């Protein structure tokens, strides 16, 4: 068995969004992974961190290093989980949005409240976000190696928790959803979610194979992605299946459905469709999605319904992966949401 530490409150709620369903002409259900717990601002990463930190503790680690943008949900949830487990959290955060030292907000504020060791990695002139991110990975790995060599074993958690260890948490998540669907006697046609680093996507596909579901999983990207990304997700999913002792396989060309049409103009940059989706859900259901991840995924789903990519009357699940702290982040991330 894979080592696991209990962090979240599962199963997370699952129910129908009656007013949104009526508005859109489909049966729209929501999976509330913003309710995974740990702290007030839970999210999908808790599922992964149960296995990642379980692995870290099984290996005798005392510290954890991880990565993200300055307002990373994953980084904040990792710090929270580390504190719960008695591990020292170290963050290497890329300044996609430059934080204001005098006005620290949202996830970065929470990281500081929890006392994480934070290293801000600025994007140098002539560098892309990806370049700076790659540099942060090297810095973090070197930091972990130094600590380990000096007698404090340090565990390196990849950005977004996207590893075969972390993705087991999301294979479990899909199995959990399947059990909730069974209880309600429901067949689902589509599952929609936001994808960033690919760990959630890989886990969902592994879980779908394990339960033999016919649901089509559609992944709305929050940053530019290409074919290499799909290959990475396929390989991650297949590693998860192998880890769980299954000989089933995810086939990139048959199983993976990714739409890159909703992240523009870029990561952590708002757009009109996401702003409309945020307002629609808030005004019809009193629920919140964020401008970086879930708002863009919901915008993709709404657009797919309106353009007939999702047939009227379909049963659709929107997987809420959390991240509403972004509503309290720097203004340039927000867009026109009221």
Q: Which residues are covered by each model-predicted region?
A:
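PLP-dependent amino-acid enzyme catalytic core
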Residues: 1-338
């Amino acid at each position: 068995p894979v080592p696991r530490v209990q962090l979240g409150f599962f199963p997370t709620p699952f129910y129908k969004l009656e007013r949104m369903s009526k508005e859109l002409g489909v049966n729209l259900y929501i999976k509330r992974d913003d309710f995974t717990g740990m702290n007030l601002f839970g999210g999908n990463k808790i599922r992964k961190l149960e296995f990642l930190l379980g692995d870290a503790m099984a290996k005798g680690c005392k510290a954890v290093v991880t990565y993200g943008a300055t307002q990373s949900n994953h980084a904040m949830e990792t710090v929270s989980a580390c504190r719960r487990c008695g591990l020292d959290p170290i963050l290497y955060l890329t300044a996609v949005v430059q934080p204001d030292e005098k006005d620290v907000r949202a996830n970065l504020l929470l990281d500081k409240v929890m006392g994480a060791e934070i290293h801000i990695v600025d994007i140098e002139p002539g560098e892309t976000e990806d370049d700076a991110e790659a540099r942060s990975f090297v810095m973090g790995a070197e930091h972990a190696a130094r600590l380990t060599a000096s007698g404090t074993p340090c565990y390196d958690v990849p950005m977004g928790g996207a590893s075969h260890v972390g993705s087991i948490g999301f294979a479990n998540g899909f199995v959990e959803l399947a059990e909730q669907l069974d209880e309600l006697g429901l067949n689902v046609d589509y599952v929609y979610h936001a994808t960033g680093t690919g760990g959630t996507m890989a886990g969902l596909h592994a879980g779908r194979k394990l339960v033999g579901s016919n649901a089509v999983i559609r992944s709305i990207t929050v940053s530019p992605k290409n074919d290499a990304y799909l290959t990475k997700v396929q390989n991650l999913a297949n590693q998860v299946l192998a880890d769980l002792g299954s000989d089933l396989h995810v086939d990139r060309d048959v199983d993976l459905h990714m739409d890159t049409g909703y992240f523009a103009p870029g990561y952590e940059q708002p757009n009109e469709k996401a702003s409309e989706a945020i307002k629609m859900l808030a005004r019809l259901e009193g629920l919140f999605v964020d401008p970086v991840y879930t708002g863009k995924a919901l915008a993709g789903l709404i657009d797919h319904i309106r353009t007939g990519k999702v047939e009227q009357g379909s049963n659709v699940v929107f997987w809420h992966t959390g991240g509403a702290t972004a509503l309290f982040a720097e203004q340039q991330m927000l867009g026109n949401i009221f």
